Amino acid sequence: MSRIGNKVITLPAGVEVSQEGTVVTVKGPKGTLSREIASQISMSVEGTEVAFTRESDDNKTKALHGTTRANVANMVEGVSEGFTKTLKLVGVGYRAAKSGSKLTLSVGYSHPVDFEDREDLTVEVPDALTVKVSGISKQRVGDLAAEIRAVRSPEPYKGKGIRYEGEVVRRKEGKTGK
């Protein structure tokens, strides 16, 4: 039994959910998102509540039931509130700068690393050591944040690198000297 799949999604004011075949579309004040759902899962919209049911109880369908409900709930949250990931740069001389539609990271390489803006995402640099990625799609925000973090992942000896806000880096002990 999928406990998450059986939960009902309550729609906030100004958000509409519609379904055409297997494509679910969510419209809200921040934009519109669409996603294809599995054919084994059916969706019903009654007033301000969205419910999901599955046609069989095999393991794959149970997994799809909860996943589909979670994906649509994230779409509803995205078009109503949006998602934000904050990254921190830790290290001597590490800095980020935004010029026009380009994010430039100086993180200890012999060259700066550039990222172009994505059409549906917003990248902000409130200060030289902080980068904020925001948008309506949780998946796209997380993907861009992961790409930025992968430029210089935190290393375990000094803790230098790009990390998510609140991320704890497990530190290792260095070599023992004689």
From Swiss-Prot:
Pfam families: Ribosomal_L6 (PF00347). GO terms for biological process: cytoplasmic translation. One of its GO terms (molecular function) is rRNA binding. Gene3D superfamilies: Ribosomal protein L6, alpha-beta domain. Keywords: Ribonucleoprotein, Ribosomal protein, RNA-binding, rRNA-binding. The keyword Cytoplasm does not apply. It comes from the Bacteria. Part of the 50S ribosomal subunit. This protein binds to the 23S rRNA, and is important in its secondary structure. It is located near the subunit interface in the base of the L7/L12 stalk, and near the tRNA binding site of the peptidyltransferase center. Belongs to the universal ribosomal protein uL6 family. HAMAP family: Ribosomal_uL6_B. This is Large ribosomal subunit protein uL6. It comes from Leuconostoc citreum (strain KM20).
